[in-house]
Regions:
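N-terminal Rossmann NAD(P)H-binding glycine-rich loop of SDR-like oxidoreductase domains
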Residues: 6-24
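Conserved Rossmann-fold NAD(P)-dependent oxidoreductase catalytic core, especially the SDR/UDP-sugar
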Residues: 101-147, 168
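NAD(P)-cofactor binding segment of oxidoreductase domains
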Residues: 71, 86-116, 153
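N-terminal Rossmann-fold cofactor-binding loop
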Residues: 31-36, 53
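Conserved small/polar residues in nucleotide/adenosyl-binding loops
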Residues: 173-178
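Active-site Tyr-X1-5-Lys
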Residues: 143-168
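Rossmann-fold cofactor-recognition segment
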Residues: 44-56
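NAD(P)H-binding glycine-rich loop region in Rossmannoid oxidoreductase-like domains
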Residues: 53-96, 127
Length: 178
């Protein structure tokens, strides 16, 4: 059975991803803080791990222990992140630095997945053309205008420079369309 880790699994999107992974037959691991609500993670088949992203060395040791006990994950969906904060430095610490720490720790611990999916945001492109309202295209330059968007772009760019690491970047956005 293939194993998947979903970070940020306690949130709305993460909880949905965990349920979908179970439905598809994956051994599903939810990366959540010990203080996080697990209301969206009630299925008894979900396994939990509390990863310490902020300390790369500790995270590497934690993942190496995981690999010895359970083997590596086949897939990682990195959905953990910060969307609101009073201190803008937290965007960069959580969204960019913790992403880099996770990628480095996965590689260094022998836990590099077959595929790593970074859940990012259309905010990494900025507002787009507000005169013509032309939809944003992946060919457009990324010009984020918020610290949140800038931190997501920093994480994307870090990942793009890791040629040894198999990844996909998923851009999420909200729509008011019915």
């Amino acid at each position: 059975m293939k194993k998947i880790l979903i970070t940020g699994a306690s949130g709305f999107i993460g909880g949905f991803l965990a349920k979908e992974a179970l439905n598809r037959g994956y051994e599903t691991w939810a990366g959540v803080r010990s203080t996080s609500s697990r209301v969206n993670l009630q299925d008894e088949r979900i396994r939990f791990i509390d990863l310490k992203y902020s300390d790369r060395e500790s995270l590497t040791a934690q993942l190496a222990d995981f690999v010895r006990e359970h083997g590596p994950w086949d897939y990682v969906i990195h959905n953990a992140g910060l969307t609101k904060t009073l201190d803008k430095r937290n965007f960069y610490r959580i969204n960019a630095q913790n992403t880099a720490n996770l990628i480095e720790a996965l590689a260094a611990s022998g836990c590099k997945p077959e595929k790593f999916l970074l859940m990012s945001s259309l905010s990494s492109y900025g507002r787009g053309d507000e005169k013509t309202f032309r939809p944003i295209s992946l060919d457009d330059p990324q010009l984020p205008d918020t610290d949140y968007g800038k931190s997501k772009l920093e994480a994307e760019n870090y990942l793009r420079h890791q040629s040894y690491f198999p990844y996909v970047i998923c851009l999420l956005y909200t729509s008011d369309a019915a």
